[in-house]
Amino acid sequence: MTVDILAFGAHPDDAEIGCGGLLLKLKDRGYRTGIVYLTVGEMGSRGTPEIRRQELTAAAKALGLDYMEVMDFQDCRVVDDFDSRLKIACVVRQQRPTIVLAPYWDGPPGRGVGHTDHQAAGYLVSHGVNFAHLRALPLESEPHSVSNLLYYLFPRELPPSFVVDISDYIDQWVEVLKCHHSQFYNPETTHYDFVDTLVAVARARGVSIGARYAQGFIAPEPLRVDDPFMLVTPRRRTPQYPT
């Protein structure tokens, strides 16, 4: 079986953070969804590889994914080279998604969004998606052309190309995030502090479109629109001040 939308994450929890709400929404609408984790996050400060595998499996179940794969790249050593692109292209050919999601490829280097693996994964998946349609490459499976490549986990100061309302899925999304207990639970406060931060970001993004919660995405090229009225949706009232 193939999927309609396939998200690539450098580590367990990347895709859940950046596009988990979208995946829940699309799954609810009947689309087939999947996530490919490049690494098991073995260099993380908390959580062993075994624990991380258990957590990503739980998250995949909570998301209702139709496909999930953990590849054999090394944490903090994800590289965009020819052989790695072939690996990504193989997955794309096998799963044949219409849309591919990947971490954004640029931004201030360092922790979080600027993690070296996030940026490398952005380049790697972009080139792998391109390789997937090239017939001359020595790959199994028939060539496949992805219709749209979209990016998540981009610097907050960058404007998104479009924003998706995930208000109806916010509670489910939070439960998905909590599956990654080793990463999000703060034993010093006995609370999921980082989850609260992510919800606040989604709240801010939602306000920008008149929704309660939303997630934004960047498209590398203009998105074709045949009927602008298909883009028009009623704005939810999101009061910020007493009236």
Predicted regions located by residue number:
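Metal-dependent de-N-acetylase/amidase catalytic core
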Residues: 1-6, 82-243
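Active-site rim/loop-helix segments in enzyme catalytic domains that contact anionic ligands
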Residues: 1-96, 230-237
